[in-house]
Structure formats: C-alpha cells, structure tokens
C-alpha cells in the first residue's frame, strides 16, 4: 500500500442515474472469461482485504465465508487456509476451473439438484464449494447462513436495475453478528458506462441501511494506466464494513 493515497472525504458524483439502464447479460460475462477479458481479476489478491483480514477474523476459525460472483479470486484460498469454509457463486465454469487449477487444488463436480443443468465444484479438502449458476438462483440451493461476505467486484458488476434484488439476496444469506465486507468504485459515471458500475454511498444506504450499520473503513486511489481507456482520469476504491444493527 506504499504510495497509495487514502482519503475519507472524497466528493461523490451527483449524476448517479446515468448508468441505471446499463445491462450486461450472463452470456456476455461468460464471453469475457472465454476471451480472456478478465482484467478485474487480481492475481495477488486484494490488498485492502490483506491489510484488514486478521482484524476481521479476530483469531476465529470455522467461519462460513461467502464470495458472490467469485471468479477465481485467490482470497478464497486465504480463508480456506485459515480453517474457514468458503462458498462462492460464479456464472463462468471456466473461471471456477481456473481457480482450482491455478491454486493446485483437486476437486469434484456434482449436479445442483435444485437448479437443473448447473453444477457445484467442491475441493477435495471439503472447505471450498463453488456453485456455477446465477447469483439469483442460489437461494434455491438452501446453502444456509454465512458469518462473512467478501463482496469485491460483485455489487459493482450487477446491473444497476438488479441491485435491490441482489442486496436482498445477500441479506438473506447473512447469519447473526455478520461482517459484510464490500468494495465499491468511485469515478465519474458520465465518462464510463460500466461495468464496473459506480456505486455511491447513498446507494449503499438505500440497499442495506435498514438492516445494517454501514461504515466506510478506507478509500484509496485505485487509478491505473489501463483505466485511461475508460475515459476517466480518477478512480477510487472504497472498503465498507456492514454489520448487524
């Protein structure tokens, strides 16, 4: 994190409606994996999570941790290696297979009986289960409640018109005394159509505020050279902690 600016008083952009009708289909997301357009994947894992992880875990083991739209996030192995049970959901079977291959983990495949035509991939160790299906179909599997959710690249990828349904799905999966770790991006939405989409603080309050205490832990400068192609010159990432009211 050296050289990374941190600020908690960044102004939000006022034109929050400009992206509201943007839509990416599940097929388009699958095509991104097939065509290798996965610049959103972080090979070294998320640095803000790495920074705060031990503080969040507080020495606990055996937690159930959920990864929405997990892709091949290396952070799943971080939690599994610390003795936690990881469940993820990802529409791309290729992304799931790449996770197990790149992490050198053996796995098995089973059909998801509640969702015909879909599969769940389970590590041989038994503590990583990745469901290959739509996030909105997942509640039908009765996967239970979770102690923690790590939402990086999920809420910001959901079509803006589907956010309320997504948030309700996430809230339905949370157990008592949960910790919901949420990363969102702040940039001028008039210059880039998304995804990832711009999610202002007011939207987080609208989606989760009735159930959750919402605290912004950190805002960091996340602008990279590749973001110039988005037509923007400024990009910040914000890490939120949502807890039970």
From Swiss-Prot:
Q: Which residues hold S-adenosyl-L-methionine?
A: 29-40, 69, 90, 134-135, 152
Q: Where is the signal peptide?
A: none
Q: What is this protein called?
A: Thiopurine S-methyltransferase
Task: Give the PANTHER family listed for this entry.
Answer: THIOPURINE S-METHYLTRANSFERASE (PTHR10259:SF11)
Instruction: State the taxonomy lineage.
Output: Eukaryota, Metazoa, Chordata, Craniata, Vertebrata
Where does the chain bind substrate? 40
UniProt-listed Gene3D superfamilies: Vaccinia Virus protein VP39
Pfam families to which the protein is assigned, alphabetical: TPMT
EC number, as in UniProt: 2.1.1.67
């Amino acid at each position: 994190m050296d050289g990374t600016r941190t600020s908690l008083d960044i102004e939000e952009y006022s034109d929050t409606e400009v992206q509201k009708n943007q839509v990416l289909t599940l097929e388009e997301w699958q095509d991104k994996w097939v065509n290798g357009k996965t610049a959103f994947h972080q090979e070294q894992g998320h640095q803000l999570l790495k920074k705060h992880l031990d503080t969040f875990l507080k020495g606990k083991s055996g937690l159930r941790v959920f990864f929405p739209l997990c892709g091949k996030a290396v952070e799943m192995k971080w939690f599994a290696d610390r003795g936690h049970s990881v469940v993820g959901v990802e529409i791309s079977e290729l992304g799931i297979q790449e996770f197990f291959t790149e992490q050198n983990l053996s796995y098995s495949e089973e059909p998801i009986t509640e969702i015909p035509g879909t599969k769940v991939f389970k590590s041989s160790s038994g503590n990583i289960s990745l469901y290959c299906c739509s996030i909105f179909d997942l509640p039908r599997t009765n996967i239970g409640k979770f102690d923690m959710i790590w939402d990086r690249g999920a809420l910001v990828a959901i079509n803006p018109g589907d956010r309320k349904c997504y948030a309700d799905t996430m809230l339905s999966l949370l157990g008592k005394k949960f910790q919901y770790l949420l990363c969102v991006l702040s940039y001028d939405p008039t210059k880039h159509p998304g995804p990832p989409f711009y999610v202002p603080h007011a939207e987080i309050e609208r989606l989760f505020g009735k159930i959750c205490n919402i605290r912004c832990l950190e805002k960091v400068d996340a602008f990279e050279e590749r973001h110039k192609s988005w037509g923007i010159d400024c990009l910040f990432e914000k890490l939120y902690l949502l807890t039970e009211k």
